[in-house]
């Protein structure tokens, strides 16, 4: 007895068993490969009989095929099936295609004319394909970086650090490893292929790199094909300009030597001009010596008059002082929390990479958020917090923050800043397997978008984060190039509530003009948003509710909206006629709440046990 003619379903079951058995943490990538192969197998249109037919499926290689073949052999032995014989349909199909294709027939005739030695070997030498790196890959960036630095046979070599600093802008991947996120390989590994193909030379200690003649030609063609323009101050451009200048000098010299009489006339004109200029200089000197002692020379008004400073308009509204900054009176700066690092070994990664892209940054401790855009006045140096703030998370850090309720607390503090554009940036790199928390992350991200009105930005790694920050900085600079700022200088901000209330009050009054934006000065934001052990009664009430297992910040806020104080909650419990009514009080009150803010029966009972049974 033989297996069905289309054993695709059977092979899919075997492949699923392989996935289920690969559960350890170090097999995470294997599981991804097998899942991809399983998806391709289920969607493969043609029948599959013999294990070798699996090689036609995208994502299934020799190793996976061997595993499935062993499982099929065991299955056949246990169930009394005969192991399938390899069919010749593939060979027949291939020969039919060769016969019907005239180009293939021609190839066969050519091979018959080759010497008998090649026929006896049965193989034909394959022509070596010319190596050309993929666009925006590691090798692509290295070639263009060396070309821009002028590191070729006629120039000097450069170190790895110098090369990476320039090559990074031409590559989408990082040239640095990051073992903390399992990034054990980097784009720098492409240097091996470049050396193997004689495009790059490595020499000396420490290693220095330069282009070969073939590498220079390839790099130049890549530059031309992709319309890349190097910086004017680069070695490549300076060398190019120097060559053009020398060519123009050579051409001028050639023109003069062709016509000797013209050259003599040119020389006579130069002599006469120099003589006239000397005479004018002597006359001017003589005239200046005749100036009397009491006569003072006139001084240019442009030099003596100091440039007036631009005045800052100041005012007071409802007892709160403010300043008005014109659009051209301030610069935009990206401020990064100094605790935001790529890894322990590379703490200045973000500031360094952004500076290479021409983005001005500052770094210090932020009391809220990880990155914020500030406006800095050109004369006073005073700073104010703009309406754009970023909270950055890696996937593993996101999972931990959700589990320990830090995620909800951070969102609450970000909302208290009053920023209109709050970005939650998630880097899809992780130090361990987080696939078991996928549903939890999806739920948290969706609630953040829908209920908190945050922007979610997903990036592949730290390098794509830098690129996104660069793009955002340019957009924000363009946006604020036409905006005036009303900077609030509140003297008595004692808590976050006053900070947010005053900001909303100013926005209502001043932002009726779309060309004006209101914001607090940076010092006020830092002092108002600092974490403190001193809590208001409202915050203490929320903390008490959140001490009950299962009560998130969203649920606590929903309870507080129905029962504003702890006293009103206790009175509501005491008004219940029976104990059963008290146990389901919160459940019934919040039955119309959104999904993540509803209180179930058991949780309502727990709340009564904690607070209502007093």
Curated annotation (Swiss-Prot):
CDD domains: WH_MUS81 (cd21036), XPF_nuclease_Mus81 (cd20074). One of its GO terms (cellular component) is Holliday junction resolvase complex. Interacts with EME1 to form a DNA structure-specific endonuclease with substrate preference for branched DNA structures with a 5'-end at the branch nick. Typical substrates include 3'-flap structures, D-loops, replication forks and nicked Holliday junctions. May be required in mitosis for the processing of stalled or collapsed replication fork intermediates. May be required in meiosis for the repair of meiosis-specific double strand breaks subsequent to single-end invasion (SEI). It is an enzyme of class 3 (hydrolase). The keyword Protein biosynthesis does not apply. This is Crossover junction endonuclease MUS81. It is found in: Nucleus. Pfam families: EME1-MUS81_C, ERCC4, MUS81-like_WH. The lineage of its organism: Eukaryota, Fungi, Dikarya, Ascomycota, Saccharomycotina.
